[in-house]
């Protein structure tokens, strides 16, 4: 195939090199350093701007975020470096059908804001992909690169909490969009626009493939989302139904996502943030999938390699090298300076995912586990535990890199989605039934979870025992693995869980009214009944501080915050003894000692009213209809 004049010329030294000797130039490194400094400055600025010395301030950003950083953080938390590598790789290998995951997410994130978030409020309730860029473009030691990245990420996550995470996510979203849109422009220019891509994609064959083999051929339905229900890689019934359940689980119940909407100052701002994220979810098709397809056109011998031995030499993966499509495009197509910008984009995608996971996991461990083990833990203790847990996650992340590197398949994104389809449906079905069917009880939910997860784990183990054969090998896997697509298995798993939960719930005692009050869609407007209004069978333990002041421990509905009972005198003595180094560390962690200690008082419950200003609510609802209409049009156009 003849390359266009604007196409990059193949490297003569080693035609099999995935990343030829081209590396980042000094200008690229300067852009990358400026990015790190800018992100660090924004992260540290947010630590000063927000209150970090309370549980609500650290884990929920004080519940005072407006819509645009919430929306940007939702998008940045979802779109990690695995999206850039995985979506582009799947686009190069099989066309744009993988875009269905992104279009599906549009509806799910809107359901979060309009359906699930009111229930949450009423109830008060990716490393390897980044390593590909860091290691290959800078030629650094893998662990050195990851340790440095994690250190910068952990610094502002530990210091600033969720506020720092959301503000830096907003910055990184802007950087990602600028860089990715720039690369998209260069990509389409290199192949002659969309028409040129449609023409050249089907001619993008590796020169080293066997003439009598179908391996490495572009799919005939590459430019369609809906595909054959029996023989395709993503059957259309599975896309419509099997894909929706894991999508609802991720967007409507995952701690990483929901925590951002709960940080909004009110329900209207949460809806606005979700709308912004929904509009941004249209972009991955154009900034990731299409560039991946362009990469196959420009570098067919490497991105579309079909011979296992050659693929092993090219990317150390005999199953295929489609996952190098995006990195290859960045390093070969962009001029000096812009390569540094795209490197910053990939690091931004990775760091936004890391900060989200670090903060959310720290929240779960501190508030759900540690607070249960130590119900009388002081607020300062909870702050320390949350930050120390982030450090532990950093160490686990470093140790986990080679495990992911060794286990990933030919298409990283598809590999991730298949695993999700085995484990997420039971959790999603149980959660949805609990929100919309008041008859669902604990025994039904437990039975459905156990059976569903057991079946999912069995399929997961079978997939590991019987991996998918290469194109040139016969498929001798058991029928349940060979013939049941993972999206169809998601539908089966959801149905089994639904029947189990319904049957067991009907055959056992229903939950009481108190158990479902303000915790389902139909009871979300029930009057609030505080725990303190219910007489306790045992007296509340009273603690006497050193200055003789009695202090009763109070429990918050969501966070169970126990006020610290250290005396004023002791606090003042500790302040005098603290060195400047200790004071600096305490300030970074949001635990600096105050000169005048405020008397212990009840922490304000984290409650956001369900009331909305009528005009704002109307504008949001109109925007919702417009967004859904756009999504339906895109589904129909590319179906």
Regions found by a protein language model. Give the residues of each.
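Membrane-embedded helix-loop-helix hairpins and adjacent transmembrane boundary segments
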Residues: 1-639
């Amino acid at each position: 195939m003849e390359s266009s004049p604007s196409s990059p010329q193949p490297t003569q030294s080693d035609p099999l090199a995935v990343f030829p000797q081209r590396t980042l130039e000094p200008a690229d490194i300067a852009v990358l350093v400026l990015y790190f400094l800018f992100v660090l400055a924004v992260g540290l600025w947010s630590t000063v701007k927000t209150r970090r010395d309370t549980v609500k301030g650290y884990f929920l950003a004080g519940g005072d975020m407006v819509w645009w950083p919430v929306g940007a953080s939702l998008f940045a938390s979802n779109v990690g470096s695995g999206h850039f590598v995985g979506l582009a790789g799947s686009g190069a290998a099989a066309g744009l059908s993988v875009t269905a995951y992104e279009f599906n997410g549009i509806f799910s994130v809107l359901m979060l804001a309009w359906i699930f978030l009111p229930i949450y409020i009423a109830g008060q309730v990716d490393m390897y992909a980044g390593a590909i860029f860091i290691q290959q473009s800078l030629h650094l030691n893998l662990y050195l690169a990851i340790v440095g990245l994690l250190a910068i990420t952990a610094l502002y996550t530990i210091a600033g909490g969720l506020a720092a995470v959301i503000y830096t996510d907003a910055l990184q979203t802007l950087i990602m969009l600028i860089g990715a849109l720039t690369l998209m422009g260069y990509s389409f220019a290199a192949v002659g626009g969309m028409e040129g891509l449609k023409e050249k994609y089907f001619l993008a064959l590796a020169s080293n493939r066997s003439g009598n083999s179908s391996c490495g051929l572009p799919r005939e339905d590459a430019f369609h989302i809906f595909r054959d229900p029996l023989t395709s890689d993503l059957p259309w019934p599975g896309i419509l139904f099997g894909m929706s359940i894991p999508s609802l689980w991720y967007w409507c119940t995952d701690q990483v996502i929901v925590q951002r909407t709960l940080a909004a100052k009110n329900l209207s701002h949460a809806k606005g943030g979700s709308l912004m994220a929904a509009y941004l979810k249209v972009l991955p098709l154009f900034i990731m999938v299409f560039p991946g397809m362009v990469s196959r056109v420009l570098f067919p011998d490497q991105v579309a390699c079909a011979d296992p031995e050659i693929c092993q030499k090219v990317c150390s993966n005999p199953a295929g090298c489609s996952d190098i499509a995006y990195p290859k495009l960045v390093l070969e197509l962009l001029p000096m300076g812009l390569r540094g910008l795209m490197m910053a984009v990939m690091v931004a995608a990775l760091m936004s995912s890391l900060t989200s996971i670090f903060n959310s996991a720290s929240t779960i461990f501190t508030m759900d586990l540690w607070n249960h083990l130590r119900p009388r833990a002081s607020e300062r203790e909870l702050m320390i535990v949350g930050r120390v847990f982030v450090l532990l996650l950093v160490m686990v992340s470093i140790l986990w890199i080679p495990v992911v590197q060794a286990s990933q398949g030919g298409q990283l994104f598809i590999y991730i989605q298949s695993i999700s389809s085995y484990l997420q449906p039971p959790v999603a079905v149980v959660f949805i039934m609990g929100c919309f069917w008041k008859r669902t009880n604990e025994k039904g939910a437990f039975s459905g979870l156990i059976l569903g997860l057991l079946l999912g784990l069995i399929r997961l183990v079978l997939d590991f025992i019987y991996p998918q054969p290469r194109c040139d090998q016969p498929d001798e896997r058991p029928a349940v693995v060979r013939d049941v697509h993972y999206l169809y298995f998601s539908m089966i798993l959801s149905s089994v869980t639904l029947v189990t939960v319904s049957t067991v719930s009907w055959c056992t005692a229903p939950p009481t009214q108190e158990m479902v009050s303000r915790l389902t869609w139909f009871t979300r407007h029930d009057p609030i009944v505080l725990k303190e209004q219910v007489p306790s069978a045992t007296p509340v333990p009273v603690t006497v501080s050193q200055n003789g002041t009695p202090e009763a421990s109070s429990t918050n509905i969501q966070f169970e915050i126990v006020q610290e009972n250290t005396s004023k005198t002791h606090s003042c003595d500790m302040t005098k003894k603290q060195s400047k180094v200790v004071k600096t560390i305490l300030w970074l962690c949001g635990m600096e000692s105050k000169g005048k200690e405020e008397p212990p008082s009840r922490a304000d419950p984290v409650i956001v009213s369900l009331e909305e200003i009528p005009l704002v609510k109307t504008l949001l609802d109109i925007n919702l209809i417009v967004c859904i209409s756009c999504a339906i049009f895109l589904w129909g156009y590319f179906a």
